[in-house]
Design a protein with these regions (language model features):
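Active-site residues of response regulator receiver
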Residues: 74
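C-terminal catalytic ATP-binding subdomain
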Residues: 1-14, 125, 130-134
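Acidic, metal-coordinating helix/loop segments flanking the phosphotransfer/catalytic sites
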Residues: 50-70
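Conserved acidic carboxylate
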Residues: 28
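Receiver (REC) domain active-site loop signature in two-component systems and cognate sites
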Residues: 77
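Charged docking surfaces used in two-component/phosphorelay signaling
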Residues: 35-43
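Hydrophobic/aromatic residues positioned on beta-strands within the core alpha/beta folds
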Residues: 101-103
């Protein structure tokens, strides 16, 4: 499960971020995880495009290389995993921030591919920190 329901959304925290001019590519193969992450991103007014696997993410970036301010990338996905997708995206757009989302506590981020990582379940404050760091 992606969300931490123990801590309700703090309206003051999300009101500090306004990403209405930013487009984020959310890459996640689990529908519930996708919905929860999209909920958090909508709370800060981000424009969200979705991809359900790494191959779809690569195609979206190929179509419009400068469209996205950030990519949030699941690691374990069908067709093409997150690491492979990030490698392909780096060839198209070397400077786009890519943040790994992983439920694996032992995921070791390859810093030449990913800029950062966030563990699942996603914590809203940690996600907002990532958003502030890379796109705000």
């Amino acid at each position: 499960m992606l969300i931490n329901w123990i801590h309700p959304i703090d309206k003051q925290d999300t009101s500090k971020l306004d990403l209405k001019d930013k487009r984020i590519l959310l890459v996640e193969d689990n529908e519930i995880n996708m919905e929860v992450a999209e909920f958090y991103l909508n709370a800060v007014h981000a424009n969200v495009d979705k991809a359900w696997n790494g191959l779809e993410a690569v195609e979206k970036v190929k179509e419009q290389p400068n469209k996205y301010s950030l990519i949030l990338m699941d690691i374990m996905m069908p067709k093409m995993n997150g690491d492979e997708a990030a490698k392909c995206i780096r060839k198209i757009h070397p400077s786009i921030p890519i943040v790994a989302m992983s439920a694996q506590s032992e995921y070791s981020m390859n810093q030449t591919i990913m800029n950062d990582s966030i563990s699942k379940p996603i914590d809203e404050q940690k996600l907002n920190h990532i958003l502030s760091k890379y796109v705000a």
